[in-house]
Amino acid sequence: VHSPFQSDPRFIKNYEISKKPRPAKSFATLIAGIDKSLGDLMDHVTEKGVAENTLILFVGDNGSDGPLGDTYGCFSSAPLRGKKGTCYEGGMRVPFIGSWVKAGKENPFKIARNHLHHQQIGTVMDIYSTILEVGGAKNPEGHVVDGFSLRKQLSGQLNPQRPDHFMCHFPHSHRSSYFTSYRKGDWKLIY
């Protein structure tokens, strides 16, 4: 969901009696729209008979862009510090949800039901390697890949191949200064 927040007319009636401000109601209708679209997608791949071979990845690209200080607002990154364009966790840590539409018994990459795994770092650079491995494809010879497959993490296991460090270089002036941050384990260096 990204600004500007224009209400999805299919769901606005669900929030008419809410005492939340208009932007929060609009945001809620957009979340309902995402939920409906995801359900439609899952129904479609099930009808086509490919649900057991379909992995859905839901990923954010950056933290919320909500105003700082509005800890309980619908656009907040709380309890994380910061927001989009900042060097803090609220600007860089985002949801990454992976799930098979229907986990087949024969699927070697099955994700355990109700399983949450958040002990290892992952980045959008890892998506390409993950899709290659899960899809049984090989990286073209000579093609350099910066990411690591998240297949083990998506199966609830730790991946010993995935380093525990991450560097973010942000050479843009987006409501903040330019910055570089380096994270290793529980530590982060910000420059």
Regions from the language model: what does each represent?
Residues 1, 31, 38, 55-60, ...:
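Beta-strand elements within well-structured catalytic alpha/beta cores of enzymes
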Residues 1-14, 42, 46-55, 89, ...:
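Active-site regions of oxyanion-processing enzymes, predominantly non-cytosolic
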Residues 11, 23, 27-30, 34-37, ...:
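Stable alpha-helical elements in mature extracytoplasmic
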Residues 33-72:
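Metal-dependent active-site segment of extracytoplasmic phospho-/sulfohydrolases and closely related
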